[in-house]
């Protein structure tokens, strides 16, 4: 069994079972399918990478949700 990974999501420390992809993280956060952008350690993560790219211990993740308005 793998050790859990510790990441920071929108400024809050979190712990998840490893391995963890961006798609799995977004499912855990109940954000899958929404309108948002994801940043990892200061770099935007393309949606096309969500299913394959794994998070690493110590990653800093920011999820910015798009809000419509006028």
Where are these regions (language model features)?
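Ubiquitin-like/PB1-type beta-grasp interaction modules and other compact soluble beta-rich domains
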Residues: 1-69
């Amino acid at each position: 069994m793998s050790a859990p990974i510790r990441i920071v999501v929108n400024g809050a420390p979190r712990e998840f079972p490893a391995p963890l992809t961006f798609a799995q993280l977004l499912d855990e956060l109940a954000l899958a399918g929404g309108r948002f952008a994801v940043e990892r350690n200061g770099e935007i993560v393309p949606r096309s990478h969500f299913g394959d790219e794994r998070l690493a211990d110590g990653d800093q993740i920011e999820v910015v949700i798009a809000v419509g308005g006028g």
